[in-house]
């Protein structure tokens, strides 16, 4: 028998499972399968780009462990994907993050030894980006990984996420549904799938409150990780057949339903993506079609957020019986 022990944590990234949704699919004539990125080593899809962006910069000779200072604006999950990589490789990491992101994110980032600077929540991700640029300008040997602009972001999804979906569905996937944060997942995986089958439909998901990709204005919303309020550089908008808008409330309700009815504890953006996928699978023209929806992160990262507000209060007020 050969040994199957990973040499380090980086070898645990990817090859996440696909699972059918069965009980939140009322009225669906198509099928919906979820790609569980919540089962990555650090519980989110961003583990893939944490790995790819650092590895890519190393291979190009742009950064060196122990010498370079990595800086990145993040809504949390990319920061965590970078933080566990930085810890494993020996980099100093400085992150800027809007103060509106969940408390779990702050704690996890600090647990991995990252330095964290909070930015004005009203300025959204733009504020975090500006702060990161300011810090880089005055920090020696600094390097901004730039997830919104870095080609290594969609590249890893083209090389891994897309092929995994194709293989996992036996090439039978008809539509990809993905929330758009940086646009890396939908661009990379979507491009790969479209090359395998030109008829595959690619659906983006964005918050109704900040529907920039649909021509709307940026605005505050509760779906952490998507709807950055601008069109990211890595996003290939021409790939997308349709952008589905989902409200924060709908996303939260669906995330709750996924836990209660499917046994899947996921974040708010997974709720948004699932709500969009179910809506698509209910359309008469999609009868018999298979939609793969990306669930970007695990629900435990949102315990302090609006997603679990009522349950948290209930739990805090419990008494011994």
Curated annotation (Swiss-Prot):
Sites of N6-(pyridoxal phosphate)lysine modification: 46
Biological-process GO terms, alphabetical: cysteine biosynthetic process from serine
Reaction(s) this enzyme catalyzes, per UniProt: O-acetyl-L-serine + hydrogen sulfide = L-cysteine + acetate
CDD domains tied to this protein: CBS_like
Alphabetical UniProt keywords: Amino-acid biosynthesis, Cysteine biosynthesis, Cytoplasm, Pyridoxal phosphate, Transferase
Cofactor: pyridoxal 5'-phosphate
NCBIfam families: cysK, cysKM
UniProt family annotation: Belongs to the cysteine synthase/cystathionine beta-synthase family.
Protein name in the entry: Cysteine synthase
Species lineage: Eukaryota, Viridiplantae, Streptophyta, Embryophyta, Tracheophyta
